[in-house]
Amino acid sequence: MASELDNLPVITTRREEAQGFLQGLVSKGLGWARKYSLFQYPFVTACCGMEFMTVASARYDLDRFGAALPRFSPRQADLLIVVGTVNCKQAPILRRVYEQIAEPKWVVAFGVCASSGGFYDNYATVQGIDRIVPVDVYIPGCPPRPEQVLDGIMLLQQKIQGQQHKLIDRKPLPVVGQEPISR
């Protein structure tokens, strides 16, 4: 049962419209900038690491997608690439690395072992890293071909550009005279 208030037009001020327009432009600009400036932290644990190194070579050139140089501290990265099998003893380490990565952060599961445990179906292997950290893109293969990795990075870039990006998420300051300010 809808009330009469639901049918009334929404009235906005020019300032609210301008803020919405400006936020849209800022969001698109930040999406474009973040899309081409991925600071990766590779968490390499197994044989897929050899194929991962191939992607950075001159033939495939991951640098043209903005994800060239790996960071050696998770605090300097925004993209976690989990390469290979993760066992149960490594799971808390992976979780801690994920928590240390700067916001906004993205995760890529590289290879079938990181995606679903691979052919290691036993008590010591984590059956997919999505049980530990949220995953944005899965790259299949054992090991994945470099072309598949580039497709996965481009898919992640599309996802990043489509997200809503904000500069600062602050509460508005109270206006003097509206209500008393208590500290």
From Swiss-Prot:
Its EC number is 7.1.1.-. [4Fe-4S] cluster binds at C47, C48, C113, C142. The gene is nuoB2. The keyword 4Fe-4S applies. GO terms for molecular function: 4 iron, 4 sulfur cluster binding; iron ion binding; NADH dehydrogenase (ubiquinone) activity; NADH:ubiquinone reductase (non-electrogenic) activity; quinone binding. Binds 1 [4Fe-4S] cluster. PANTHER family: NADH DEHYDROGENASE, NADH DEHYDROGENASE [UBIQUINONE] IRON-SULFUR PROTEIN 7, MITOCHONDRIAL. The keyword Cell membrane applies. One of its GO terms (biological process) is electron transport coupled proton transport. NDH-1 is composed of 14 different subunits. Subunits NuoB, C, D, E, F, and G constitute the peripheral sector of the complex. This is NADH-quinone oxidoreductase subunit B 2. InterPro entries: NADH_UbQ_OxRdtase-like_20kDa, NADH_UQ_OxRdtase_20Kd_su. One of its GO terms (cellular component) is plasma membrane. It catalyses: a quinone + NADH + 5 H(+)(in) = a quinol + NAD(+) + 4 H(+)(out). It is a peripheral membrane protein. NDH-1 shuttles electrons from NADH, via FMN and iron-sulfur (Fe-S) centers, to quinones in the respiratory chain. The immediate electron acceptor for the enzyme in this species is believed to be ubiquinone. Couples the redox reaction to proton translocation (for every two electrons transferred, four hydrogen ions are translocated across the cytoplasmic membrane), and thus conserves the redox energy in a proton gradient. Keywords: 4Fe-4S, Cell inner membrane, Cell membrane, Iron, Iron-sulfur, Membrane, Metal-binding, NAD, Quinone, Translocase, Transport, Ubiquinone. It is found in: Cell inner membrane. Its cofactor is [4Fe-4S] cluster.
